[in-house]
Design a protein with these regions (language model features):
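N-terminal binding-site loop/beta-alpha segment at the start of enzyme catalytic domains
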Residues: 1-75, 294
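Beta/alpha (TIM)-barrel catalytic core signal, keyed to glycine-rich beta->alpha loops juxtaposed to Asp/Glu
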Residues: 3, 129-295
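N-terminal small/glycine-rich loop or linker at the start of catalytic domains
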Residues: 7-25, 78-96, 125
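Alpha-helix N-cap and loop-to-helix initiation/capping positions
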Residues: 28-35, 58, 93-104, 130-137, ...
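Active-site groove signature of glycoside hydrolases
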Residues: 113-132
Length: 295
C-alpha cells in the first residue's frame, strides 16, 4: 500500500478506513472492532478516519475501547471537531451549529483524547466551515494544538479554497489536507477549482463518500455501472475497487476514505490499489458520470 507524506512527521496510507458508521453496526464489541482494524492492517491500510460527532458522539469511544497499545502504534487516527448537534454530550443545545472557537477546539481535543484513550491525535480536522469563524483565533488554537503535541498535524474538511486561504492566513502551522466529497457521483471538485487549489499548494486531499454513499451502484446510470463492471471483471476486482481507483488515478494524490461495517467488504478495500487506470479508461468513466462527452 502506498503512503502519502502530509508533513515532516506524518504519513498516512493511501486508502483510509472511515468509521462514520461504526456505531451503527449490530456488533460494536471490542473483538469485532479489533477485527476490522486488523483487516485494514493486513492490507497496509493504517489510517482510521473518525470525528467527534460520528455515532452521536459515541464512535470515538467505541474505537478507544478496542485500542490496545499494539494496535495504536500501528495506526494513524484522524478526527474532526466543530459540529455541535443536539445529541449525545450536546443533547441540551437547541440548534445544530458550528463552533471554531479556541475553547471549543480545546474541549473537543480533550474529549477525543480521553474517549479514544490516546495521548495524541495524528490529524485533527475542522469538520465544516464556520460562518462565525475568527480565523486568527481558530488559527492560533490549531497552532497551539500542534505545538502542545496533542495533534501531529491539522487540516480541514469541506472547505472551499477561500475558506482555506482565510484560515491559513491566521496560522503559522501549515494545513495538510482538505477532506471533501469526491466520487464519480460528485465530480465537481475536478472542475470547480477545489482540486486545482490543493494541487497548486502541494496538499494531498482526502475524499469522503468515494462511492457516493453506495448510490453509485443503485443509480439510474446503467452505462456507468456497466463500465465499472466490465473494467472490474477484466482486472479481477469489483465495481467499488474500480470507482475508487478512478480517484487514485488523479495526480493530486487523493486519499479516499472508505467506510463499511461488513468485514468481508473491509478485506477488499485494498483491491482499489491494484487497478490499472489509463487516461482513456478514466475519461470513459468520467464521460458516463457526466452523461455526455467532454467538450
Amino acid at each position: 500500500m502506498d503512503r502519502i507524506k502530509l508533513n515532516d512527521t506524518l504519513e498516512m496510507s493511501r486508502l483510509v478506513y472511515g468509521m462514520w458508521r461504526i456505531g451503527d453496526d449490530t456488533d460494536t464489541s471490542i473483538a469485532h472492532i479489533q477485527n476490522k482494524v486488523s483487516a485494514c492492517l493486513d492490507q497496509g491500510i493504517t489510517t482510521m478516519d473518525q470525528a467527534d460527532i460520528y455515532g452521536g458522539y459515541a464512535a470515538e469511544e467505541i474505537l478507544g475501547n478496542a485500542l490496545t497499545p499494539e494496535l495504536r502504534n500501528q495506526i494513524e487516527i484522524v478526527t474532526k471537531c466543530d459540529i455541535v448537534a443536539p445529541m449525545g454530550r450536546y443533547a441540551d443545545v437547541s440548534v445544530k451549529y458550528y463552533d471554531t472557537s479556541r475553547a471549543h477546539i480545546f474541549a473537543s481535543v480533550e474529549h477525543s483524547l480521553r474517549l479514544m484513550k490516546i495521548d495524541h491525535i495524528d490529524l485533527l480536522l475542522i469538520h465544516r466551515p464556520d460562518p462565525l469563524m475568527d480565523h486568527n483565533e481558530t488559527g492560533a488554537a490549531l497552532d497551539e494544538v500542534v505545538a502542545s503535541g496533542k495533534a501531529r498535524a491539522v487540516g480541514v474538511s469541506n472547505f472551499r479554497p477561500y475558506d482555506w486561504d482565510l484560515l491559513q492566513s491566521g496560522m503559522k502551522t501549515k494545513l495538510v489536507t482538505n477532506q471533501i466529497e469526491m466520487s464519480l457521483m460528485c465530480h465537481t471538485p475536478f472542475t470547480n477549482g477545489d482540486l486545482a487549489h490543493l494541487q497548486r499548494l502541494g496538499v494531498p486531499p482526502m475524499a469522503w463518500s468515494p462511492l457516493g454513499g453506495g448510490a453509485l451502484f443503485h443509480s439510474s446510470n446503467t452505462g456507468l455501472r456497466e463500465k465499472l463492471t466490465k473494467i472490474g471483471a477484466a482486472q479481477g476486482v469489483d465495481e467499488a475497487a474500480v470507482a475508487v481507483a478512478w480517484l487514485l488515478a488523479h495526480p493530486a494524490s487523493i486519499l479516499p476514505v472508505l467506510g463499511t461495517n461488513n468485514l468481508d467488504r473491509i478485506k477488499q478495500i485494498g483491491d482499489a490499489a491494484k487497478v490499472e487506470m489509463d487516461r482513456q479508461t478514466w475519461f470513459a468513466l468520467y464521460t458516463e458520470a457526466l452523461g455526455h462527452e467532454v467538450a
